[in-house]
Amino acid sequence: MAKIFFYGAISLDGYLSDVNDGLQWLFDTEVGDKLTTDAFLDTVETVVMGRITYEEARKYVQPLYPGKDVVVFTHNTNFDVQEGFAVSEDPVDYLRKLKEQQSGNIWVVGGMNLLKNIIVADLIDEWWIQIAPVLLGNGKRLFEQSDYQTRLELIDITQMKQLTELHFRRPENKKDSPSL
C-alpha cells in the first residue's frame, strides 16, 4: 500500500502562494546546496496537484517531474495536460483507491482547494513543510479553517540556508498518539 505525502514550502505566516498564485518569494529564498527535493522525489511514484498548481509549476519546472505519473485534478474535463493526465472525479475517493492499488508513494503538491479536502479526510501520512523567512501578509494558506484536528510526530528538522524543513508523520497507531 502506498503512502500519501505532502512536500511543500510556506511563508513564515503560513501562505503557499501570494494573492496571484505566485511563488517568486520562494524562488528568491536562498537555499544553498542541501536541498532535500531529489531524495524526496526518489521515494515517490505519483505526483498529484490541482490545475492552478499545475499551470504555475510548468512556468518554473520543465520537464515536470520526469519518470513520475502526474495527476492533475480539474473540474474542466477539456483541460489539456501536457505532462500527465487530468482527473475530474472526487480527489478524496480517487486518492483512497490509488493508495490501495499501488505500492509507490503519492506526493500531493497542492493547491489549497485540493489539499483542504485531503487534509479533512486525514489522508496525508507524512508532511515535509519548508518554511521561508518571508511574511506575505496575504495569499493562499496551507491550512484553512476546517475540522481536521490531528496530532503529528516530528521526525526531523533540516536547515537549508534560509529555508527550514520540518518533517512530520501521522502516528501509525492513532490510539497511542498524544491527545490534543
Residue ranges and their predicted role:
Residues 1-180:
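Enzymes that bind and transform nitrogen-containing heteroaromatic metabolites
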